């Protein structure tokens, strides 16, 4: 009864071996012309005019300078860019590559000669070409005509931690950065030097590898980080506790101590750290002695508690018993967090103002507290995770309280849109609920003619980067201090334009109907807004429930 071994099988003979697949060569970079339609003023108070002409050229008269967006959002320090500007100007001009008007990263040349090609290395964030008069203290530039700008991008870096086939990075959490050192409720943390700051974020998708982007965009000096750790938050969202068994060191270029240079955004190394969707992660940072006290980059409307203690407590389980503990509801130097996901994963950016930022979700006079995660974006993320077809869709909240297209609190919406949409990983959708802060007690409807071109630029930028745009008509505000007949008229013009085919949006998300009083659609329902009239404090869940999830299914 001893089993007989199966006879050996003979390998087939003369079967040709397939040649190994050849990898397609990476095409050499070529120069191409920038789209000039996004040209804008460098400074908000510039009274001159910039005109995009029908032939695609752009002209300016009596302006302080001009910003032209670059079309590569993946430029990093060390990359080489070649630029040729064609046109003419009334005066000698100088050129910069810049983050925005106030943060120049690399000077192209001074002066800049039209038709000449300049090659230079990126030394900071690169979003725009900035053109202005050569002399610092000169009067406005009388005239400038740009017929074409040619660019060639030469990537000069090695990809860190390459991913296996079928995988990619997708941002799972993000926030809109702004200067915060003078903001109530946040400024009590300044100075940050030689303190530990524990910040809590809630991820919206799952992954087993993790990385952070850290921003010092508004700082004029470097941020010194002595140590940074991440860990799962403990059982209660309103406490500083961490699960110490998950405590993990964060490094940059392999170093536990590092700096975030002035005006720059850096990326951490890949962290082996598994997260589950809707889980809270604690980011604990011990700052060194050099941290800016002005131009502090952060976000004042976290709606989540941040903890600060003296000394290095990054691995301490609970900060509640540490002497000198402070709390606030803001974030510092965090831009976003990403996880590795399958290739079909994607992110949606919620771009807006205080309504998107969740104003009122921590309103003490209504019995509300921080750490509730009840912004409309939070409810939206929960719905996406409850739907099998959208579990791989993350939510990034890019709302800033008091923000407007033309200014308001924080960086103007028209200036930050590019950063807040394109600098995240894996963005496939954008929801725009924005503009109410531009409608404060208007006397007539002429503001519509200023706002419409800015919306058009936002929509065009998204489409140029294969991002679907869903417009959310501006919510009613009839019982707020903003209301006037002119303001209501502009709201209706914007909303009707969004709903028309002329706008070019890919769909409408009707938050307006979800929160409007059916008996008086100019007002938000009383049970949602209470005495505010503008913010739907208790209507954020109704807003999220109004979103058709099929719009986010592939």
PLM feature spans:
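N-terminal secretory targeting modules
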Residues: 3-8, 12, 18-32, 154-351, ...
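Short carbohydrate-recognition loop motifs
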Residues: 48-63, 179-185
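Extracellular ligand-binding interfaces
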Residues: 56, 60-74, 79-125
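Extended extracellular/luminal ectodomain segments enriched in beta-structured repeat modules
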Residues: 74-82, 125-128, 205-211, 343-346
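Extracellular carbohydrate recognition
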Residues: 136-151
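Catalytic His-Asp segment of secreted/periplasmic serine-dependent ester chemistry enzymes
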Residues: 440, 475-554
């Amino acid at each position: 009864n001893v089993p007989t071994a199966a006879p050996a099988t003979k390998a087939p003979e003369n079967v040709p071996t397939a040649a190994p697949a050849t990898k397609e060569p990476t095409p050499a970079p070529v120069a191409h012309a920038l789209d000039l339609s996004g040209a804008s003023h460098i400074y908000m108070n510039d009274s001159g005019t910039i005109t995009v002409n029908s032939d695609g050229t752009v002209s300016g008269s009596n302006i302080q300078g001009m910003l032209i967006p670059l079309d590569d959002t993946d430029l990093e320090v060390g990359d080489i860019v070649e630029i040729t500007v064609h046109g003419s100007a009334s005066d000698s001009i100088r050129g910069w590559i810049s983050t925005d008007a106030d943060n120049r990263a690399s000077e192209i040349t001074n002066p800049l000669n039209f038709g000449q090609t300049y090659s230079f290395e990126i030394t900071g964030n690169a979003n725009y070409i900035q053109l202005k008069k050569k002399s610092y203290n000169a009067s406005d530039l009388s005239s400038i005509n740009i017929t074409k700008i040619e660019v060639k991008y030469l990537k000069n870096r090695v990809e860190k931690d390459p991913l296996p086939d079928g995988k990619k990075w997708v941002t799972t959490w993000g926030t809109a950065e702004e200067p915060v050192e003078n903001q109530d409720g946040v400024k009590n943390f300044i100075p940050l030097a030689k303190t530990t700051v524990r910040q809590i974020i809630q991820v919206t998708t799952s992954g087993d590898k993790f990385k952070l982007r850290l921003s010092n965009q508004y700082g004029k000096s470097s941020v010194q980080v002595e140590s940074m750790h991440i860990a799962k938050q403990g059982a209660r969202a309103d406490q500083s506790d961490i699960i110490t068994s998950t405590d993990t060191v964060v490094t940059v270029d392999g170093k536990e101590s590092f700096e975030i240079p002035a005006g720059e955004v850096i990326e951490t190394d890949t962290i082996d750290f598994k997260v589950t969707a809707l889980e809270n992660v604690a980011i604990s940072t011990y700052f060194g002695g050099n941290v800016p006290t002005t131009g502090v980059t952060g976000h004042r409307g976290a709606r989540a508690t941040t903890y600060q203690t003296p000394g290095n407590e990054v691995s301490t389980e609970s900060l509640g018993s540490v002497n000198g503990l402070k709390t606030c509801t803001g974030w510092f130097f965090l831009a976003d967090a990403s996880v590795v996901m399958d290739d079909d994963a994607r992110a949606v950016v919620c771009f807006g103002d205080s309504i998107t930022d969740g104003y009122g979700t921590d309103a003490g006079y209504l019995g509300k507290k921080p750490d509730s995660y009840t912004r409309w974006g939070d409810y939206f993320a929960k719905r996406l995770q409850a739907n099998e077809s959208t579990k791989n869709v993350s939510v990034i909240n890019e709302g800033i309280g008091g923000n407007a297209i033309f200014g308001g609190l924080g960086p103007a919406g028209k200036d930050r849109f590019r950063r807040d949409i394109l600098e995240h990983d894996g963005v496939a959708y954008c929801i725009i609920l924005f503009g109410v802060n531009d409608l404060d007690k208007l006397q007539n409807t002429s503001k519509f003619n200023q706002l419409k071109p800015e919306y058009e630029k936002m929509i065009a930028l998204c489409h140029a980067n294969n991002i679907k745009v869903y417009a959310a008509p501006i919510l009613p505000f009839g019982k707020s201090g903003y209301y006037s007949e002119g303001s209501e008229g502009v709201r209706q013009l914007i909303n009707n334009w969004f709903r028309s085919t002329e706008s070019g949006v890919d769909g409408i998300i009707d938050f307006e109907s979800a929160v409007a009083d059916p008996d008086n659609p100019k007002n938000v329902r009383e049970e949602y807004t209470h005495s505010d009239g503008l913010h739907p404090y208790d209507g954020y869940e109704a807003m999220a429930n109004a979103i058709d999830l099929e719009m986010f299914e592939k």
